[in-house]
Amino acid sequence: MLFRSAAMAETLAEPKTETRLDTPWNVVVHNDPVNLMSYVTMVFQKVFGYSREKAQTHMLEVHYRGRSIVWSGVRERAEFYVQQLHGYLLLATLEKPE
């Protein structure tokens, strides 16, 4: 004999979340007083495959504005990019868009 209570049915229900799975996550690089601008440009080219011009644009945004969103997409890939940037000793974070 199988009895189901309302409490049990409630615990088995799918959790309600406001975050959609397809919401893009941002990879943000922050300015630091250590790395040379040419080095940061080179890292962007290697990690993201950016052209020199696009890499320089992001580097200058980091330099003058203090941060730049260098990539946006699925969370797993964004986490991977943040780890790669940390490997090059850049200050990078993962942010969920508002």
Would you name each region that the model predicts?
Residues 1-2:
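Short, small-residue-biased leader/transition segments that mark boundaries at the very start
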Residues 13-20, 26, 31, 79-98:
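A cross-kingdom feature marking charged/low-complexity
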Residues 35, 39-82, 86:
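Amphipathic, hydrophobic secondary-structure cores in small proteins
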Residues 8-9:
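Eukaryotic nuclear low-complexity, Arg/Ser/Gly/Pro-rich intrinsically disordered regions
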